[in-house]
Curated annotation (Swiss-Prot):
Keywords: Magnesium, Metal-binding, Thiamine biosynthesis, Transferase
The protein's name in its UniProt record: Thiamine-phosphate synthase
Catalytic activity: 2-[(2R,5Z)-2-carboxy-4-methylthiazol-5(2H)-ylidene]ethyl phosphate + 4-amino-2-methyl-5-(diphosphooxymethyl)pyrimidine + 2 H(+) = thiamine phosphate + CO2 + diphosphate; 2-(2-carboxy-4-methylthiazol-5-yl)ethyl phosphate + 4-amino-2-methyl-5-(diphosphooxymethyl)pyrimidine + 2 H(+) = thiamine phosphate + CO2 + diphosphate; 4-methyl-5-(2-phosphooxyethyl)-thiazole + 4-amino-2-methyl-5-(diphosphooxymethyl)pyrimidine + H(+) = thiamine phosphate + diphosphate
Binding locations of 2-[(2R,5Z)-2-carboxy-4-methylthiazol-5(2H)-ylidene]ethyl phosphate: T134, N135, T136, G164, V184, S185
Gene Ontology MF term list: magnesium ion binding; thiamine-phosphate diphosphorylase activity
Cofactor note: Binds 1 Mg(2+) ion per subunit.
Residues at which 4-amino-2-methyl-5-(diphosphooxymethyl)pyrimidine binds: Q37, L38, R39, E40, K41, N69, S108, K137
Top EC category: transferase
Amino-acid positions noted as binding Mg(2+) in the UniProt annotation, renumbered to this chain: D70, D89
Function: Condenses 4-methyl-5-(beta-hydroxyethyl)thiazole monophosphate (THZ-P) and 2-methyl-4-amino-5-hydroxymethyl pyrimidine pyrophosphate (HMP-PP) to form thiamine monophosphate (TMP).
Pathway given in the UniProt record: Cofactor biosynthesis; thiamine diphosphate biosynthesis; thiamine phosphate from 4-amino-2-methyl-5-diphosphomethylpyrimidine and 4-methyl-5-(2-phosphoethyl)-thiazole: step 1/1
Cofactors (names): Mg(2+)
Organism: Methanobrevibacter smithii (strain ATCC 35061 / DSM 861 / OCM 144 / PS)
The encoding gene: thiE
Length: 209
């Protein structure tokens, strides 16, 4: 997938207050978020489907790709831009055969072996983490900075770092060679999602200037 801007990659969290949830996404897009991944691990299928349609309406307005976490059925049903799968989700190779060559396929990896396998199975990018402690995912594997650098060097596809990234620590990843910052709480729980997005993007752009 060419020209995929992964600079600031938003992964959503729980959407209990739908109006607030959709507003956060829109504000983050105004602040420069370049990809949105809709992640709903507990939602009923119909609720997820309806929410995904609403989120897609917003992302299309800003010409930003919408990725669905894990649920290939939802991604296909709403014609999302792609799917992201973890190590315990549908195998990447199977996901690719289901979504076709034109959709974006992202894969989570926590080590070089997983990253290389994802590349072989035609992933368009890899999400590596958790680079910092995170409350979003209880079972997240910790990936030291040294390991992150080695993963980046081991593959030819883009890598985004995820896990506990904030405006305060993002600069610590400056020399890792990553293609983007993937965040959840730093935007979803920010008082001002637009400004939070702008600041995170500034941190990332600063290291790439």
């Amino acid at each position: 997938m060419n020209n995929l801007d992964l600079s600031l990659y938003l992964v959503t969290n729980n959407s209990e207050d739908e109006e607030k949830f959709l507003n956060i996404i829109e504000e983050s897009l105004k602040g420069g978020v370049s990809v949105v991944q809709l992640r709903e691990k507990k939602a009923e299928t119909l609720d997820f489907y309806n929410l995904a349609l609403k989120v897609k309406e917003i992302t299309q307005k800003y010409n930003v790709p919408l990725i669905i976490n894990d649920r290939i059925d939802i991604a296909l049903a709403i014609d999302a831009d792609g799917v992201h799968v973890g190590q315990s989700d549908m195998p990447a190779k199977t996901a690719r055969s289901m979504i076709g060559e034109d959709k974006i396929l992202g894969v989570s990896a926590a080590n070089i072996k997983e990253a290389k396998k994802a590349q072989r199975e035609s992933a368009d990018y890899i999400g590596v983490g958790a680079v910092y402690p995170t409350n979003t995912k209880d079972d997240a594997t910790s990936v030291p900075k040294k390991e992150l650098k080695e993963i980046v060097k081991s593959v030819d596809i883009p890598v985004v770092a995820i896990g506990g990234i904030t405006q305060e620590n993002a600069h610590e990843l400056n020399d890792c060679g990553i293609d983007g910052l993937s965040v959840v709480s730093a935007i979803m729980e920010a008082k001002n999602p637009k400004i939070a997005s702008e600041n995170l993007l500034k941190e990332f752009k600063a290291k790439n200037s």
